[in-house]
Amino acid sequence: MKALLDLFKQVTQEEEFDAIKIGIASPDKIRSWSYGEVKKPETINYRTFKPERDGLFCARIFGPVKDYECLCGKYKRLKHRGVICEKCGVEVTLSKVRRERMGHIELASPTAHIWFLKSLPSRLGMVLDMTLRDIERVLYFEAYVVTDPGMTPMQYRQLLTEEDFLDKEDQYGEEFVAMMGAEAVKELLKKLDLDAEIEGLRRELETTNSDTKIKKIAKRLKVLEAFQRSGMKPEWMILEVLPVLPPELRPLVPLDGGRFATSDLNDLYRRVINRNNRLKRLLELRAPDIIVRNEKRMLQESVDSLLDNGRRGKAMTGANKRPLKSLADMIKGKGGRFRQNLLGKRVDYSGRSVITVGPTLRLHQCGLPKKMALELFKPFIFHKLEVMGLASTIKAAKKLVEQEVPEVWDILEEVIREHPVLLNRAPTLHRLGIQAFEPVLIEGKAIQLHPLVCAAFNADFDGDQMAVHVPLSLEAQMEARTLMLATNNVLSPANGEPIIVPSQDIVLGLYYMTRDKVNGKGEGMVFADTKEVHRAYETRQVELATRITVRLKEWEKDEQGEFQPVIKRYNTTVGRAILSDILPKGLPFEHINKALKKKEISKLINVSFRRCGIRDTVIFADQLMYTGFAYSTRGGISICVDDMQIPVKKSELLGEANKEVKEIEEQYRQGLVTQGERYNKVVDIWGRTGDKIAKAMMDELSKQKVLDREGKEVDQESFNSIYMMADSGARGSAAQIKQLAGMRGLMAKPDGSIIETPITANFREGLTVLQYFISTHGARKGLADTALKTANSGYLTRRLVDVTQDLVVIEDDCGTSNGFTMKAVLQGGDVIEALRDRILGRVTAVDVVDPSTGETVIEAGTLMDEHLVDLVDSLGIDEVKVRTAITCDTRYGLCAKCYGRDLARGKQVNAGEAIGVIAAQSIGEPGTQLTMRTFHIGGAASRNAAASQVEGKSNGTVRFSSQMRYVANTKGELIVITRSGEVVIHDDMGRERERRKVPYGATLMVTDGLQIKAGAVLATWDPHTRPIITEYAGRVKFENVEEGNTVAKQTDEVTGLSTLVVIDPKRRAGSQSKMLRPLVKLLDDNGNEVKLAGSDASVSITFQVGAIITVRDGQDVGKGEVLARIPQESSKTRDITGGLPRVAELFEARSPKDAGMLAEVTGTVSFGKDTKGKQRLIITDLEGNGYENLIPKDKHVLVHDGQVVNRGESIVDGPVDPHDILRLQGIEALARYIVQEVQEVYRLQGVKINDKHIEVIIRQMLRRVIITDSGDTEFIQGEQVERADVLEMNDKMMAENKEPAQYENVLLGITKASLSTDSFISAASFQETTRVLTEAAIMGKRDDLRGLKENVIVGRLIPAGTGLAYHRTRRRQNLGLDAGESMLFDPAPAALESGE
């Protein structure tokens, strides 16, 4: 028996390994893998179905076809194991060796490996320093290459055509050697002296100054040094021996009717073998050179096709004209080995079915159909049946189950008890898309799902399906129960707020029962406790919304932390009193003593979670759900056409709007406004009118007149069904009601521009044919967008996951005191995100000091919880420096302190949490949701009416920011003449309360130091044009304003009036006029040019492209007057269509087109001599060095002569380039920019995401650095390397008193960052598999399997979560350490060598 068991042990060979290394295999290595040479192209004998000898399926080379049986049948059975049959030469062993044994083909002529040739940049070209074109000409026998010039004047590696070669042969005879084909290239590679070459290149690097040359040399040096370091020889890039894949991996399957289905690889191999054999024969026959050459070329081509079909020339096709699938195709792409089989596997023990509502379930339960449970838990049931003695064998047990005898159901109940199952709904966009539940057996065939978890799964019951998986092992069950059970996932990992929040009917029911009503039945009654209230309600003495007084028992904690009852009297309503029964201990009644809307309920659950803990919260949420359902049923809230009340003032408002539009049309006819302005103003009027009607409608809907107890008429909140649905947040929104009962409003065209004719009707009145037709535009765009954007969003998530997948919390504290300073986020002066929300759940980096007393209130390294945040709030602290993922010093991971609170658990994050993936999911998940949001409003244009003034929101003192500059015009108004001016309002304590940007050309309504009340107008402006304003008075003198050259006279057909418009230089005729810049000089009374204050340069004001000039030559102008105006483009509707690509653009770190410019240094601005299309701006720093910037003339310069700018300040208008921010302002400014921009997109959609997640991704975008000076290290200048590697190397250098490397930060887009990761397995499974593997092989890269993805691919536990412990213990055993020492991610000892 023991021998029999040993037998099985032999078969499974497991290799323990800690790293995987990839390299180029030498010919000897390939021969050592091989079990024999494949000499014939035959596969299987079509009569006997036995593999042909020496063919592609040969049993002698690859192993027996049947287990323990040789081919001729002489040896059968186990006892002959390991014998080699003398007749057929087959070893008697398991047939599965046919999956592992390789063969080889000895090539008659060397061939180049196409990956090293054609995968850009060509590695062969790099090593030989020849162009790809030249190498190809040699390889494919179009040219000779000189491999040994001898005494002749020819160059080494010189190419010769056929004629050249013959000439030279006549001339020099045998003096020189020239060859062609792969032999030639191989010869060149052999002659390459790596050491000397590297030495030469290093010398050249030091002497050369040209940037392009440095780059080129560095690249070549990198490749050569890789060869030198790894001990691989460059000539191995040329194949002499071709390995043959084991036959079971390229099977040949007989179909019925005597035909065979075969893998394409067999065809490709057959061609190689055929051509190879033919070439051997030709060489033996000493065939003419040209024939041999042709055959060699064909051999090279067939090997190319085998390795990577279609990379060079046309792809080889099979019988049915489709390209054959080569080895490279097998591993790359979505259907390749990596993504199809290694990263995504299918699992057993699963079922799927439609889901329905389970309103009676508890939060941790799901309803599982009996039939399904029986199938899923079969093995457990079999076991139980045997144990109980009801069945003696598995077969018998199976029979019992099939007959469904009553005992089986009892056993099923028992087996299922406390055995959680996993439910999953595709698409699984974040980790809450898979949760564990305890199954409850139900009749029917649909799975029942608890309504409160629908939000997490994004599920609804309109036919969604879900999959069930059964965790089998004890560990799996334990993990499912502790980590994945629905009750343990109350908070969303994206923002730390509850995700089990009641919605729809539940909200409606709770809202209905907590509303109050004037003069309800039994108003003013007083009750002793809630039981009395219940009785009164049941006996119909009071209504649900009646206002009453009731005495309630509340629980408050005393000093010992014990709950003590406290009796209080409350003025409340019947419904609220009844609801108070389900409040958990320690939650005050005032939290529900109001009309509960969706937001309030969410807050309620949040407060409950923080105060009462997870257990009570879950029970409370369940109770809320039952109550909500019950009372929404009692409420009987329905919808009826009469509920949609059309406002009385509608026709009046429409009349006014039409009148205004007519006026504007009139102005347009008189030429007072341009076409664009007219359009903008009309759209604006209709936008405003729509809002007014909506407001009037909401006012009428939301109030109703009733009589109170005294018989007086009072307003009370309406009980209109539609209003209640929208107000409670159960269904619908103001925007939707506006379309039902107000007016539909403006519609957008598919390109986003707004149609200026609004739809004045609403759905209740019905639309005319034209209105209906206009609407179809927007509605259809919504549907088309959805389809396209779902894919984009999924791709964004995939890239995010890939860039962050190896980021795991691996230690408690990295000990840094770096961090970012957090302030409240202001936009347009409003606080959109308070400081408290930004620092909640973060760890302080430095002590927090009370500004009034100067004492430390919170020490550094403290996790900010709700109490501490309140403290910061109450002390009026404006900014707090907190730790962040970006500045964490942990290498190959992150520390818990820099990350802070685990949002989904509400406490400090645990080691092993895969925060990278969580961040990626949190950012990617809403992307998909948002993409599907467009069509809910049915394409109605939602756009804010253009802002034309700015108001102060608080009382205080006005202060102008340091950049603010203004002039007083002739009317005494203050006109702003800077683009970066801000009005700041300070409160009595001198703290900044708000900051308002004021645009160029605005009229200020306040002065510096003025006291204002909230709501005061600070400045006004025309929103539809940008003015060009003069700061000086004088007489206008035009220069270069030449009609037909630089400006065009535009006559309006309607009005017959003409204006001058500046023409775009690109559109101007003649090269002279392209150079000219139309501008204005000002003359004083004596006719001299007015000079700039404090300098002798004269004032010149340039007109930008598209400016409409409003002054005439020779006209007198005063300060602050408008010389020209530039019409603003009509605004488009903003929705996430702009949003999703915007997020992708930020994370890809793309430079925006026509980006603005930032000042490179701090200094003084001056203008130099202009060139053809550019103006020259010079910044002179304090040392007197000038830095020149050439700026295209159509760009808008934000600075003026003599202005002092700081490094990193904006000098040319336009979107900023994140790379510039990093270079000039540093990491913190860059992080702030990306976080703010990304957040803005999500905020627009009302999605909350914690900044942490974005920071985690920015950390990954910054993980590479560029070496600026290599010091004594092995790095090459200009090389990109992992930050962690540089830091480690520098530590080593410092320890040995050597010169460390200098580096600068570099920002990589997420795709680039994923591909440039150290792990080649991870990169190859992401994108561009061929390129990644080629590079890795040349570099002889070694993958230490640090990330999650690499470990999934090699099939072991991931180093995160519970898998982290497994990896830690494995490392310890390998290094023989005590259990005490934690060696987390140290270099692994033995690497698995695959190709030395």
From Swiss-Prot:
Binding site for Mg(2+): 460, 462, 464
Keywords recorded for this protein, A-Z: DNA-directed RNA polymerase, Magnesium, Metal-binding, Nucleotidyltransferase, Transcription, Transferase, Zinc
A GO CC term assigned to this protein in UniProt: DNA-directed RNA polymerase complex
EC number assigned by the record: 2.7.7.6
InterPro entries linked: DNA-dir_RpoC_beta_prime (IPR045867), DNA-dir_RpoC_beta_prime_bact (IPR012754), RNA_pol_asu (IPR000722), RNA_pol_N (IPR006592), RNA_pol_Rpb1_1 (IPR007080), RNA_pol_Rpb1_3 (IPR007066), RNA_pol_Rpb1_3_sf (IPR042102), RNA_pol_Rpb1_4 (IPR007083)
Pfam families on file: RNA_pol_Rpb1_1 (PF04997), RNA_pol_Rpb1_2 (PF00623), RNA_pol_Rpb1_3 (PF04983), RNA_pol_Rpb1_4 (PF05000), RNA_pol_Rpb1_5 (PF04998)
GO MF annotations, alphabetized: DNA binding; DNA-directed RNA polymerase activity; magnesium ion binding; zinc ion binding
Cofactor annotation: Mg(2+); Zn(2+)
Domain of life: Bacteria
Catalytic activity field: RNA(n) + a ribonucleoside 5'-triphosphate = RNA(n+1) + diphosphate
Job of this protein: DNA-dependent RNA polymerase catalyzes the transcription of DNA into RNA using the four ribonucleoside triphosphates as substrates.
Name of the protein: DNA-directed RNA polymerase subunit beta'
Native source organism of the sequence: Chromobacterium violaceum (strain ATCC 12472 / DSM 30191 / JCM 1249 / CCUG 213 / NBRC 12614 / NCIMB 9131 / NCTC 9757 / MK)
UniProt lineage: Bacteria, Pseudomonadati, Pseudomonadota, Betaproteobacteria, Neisseriales
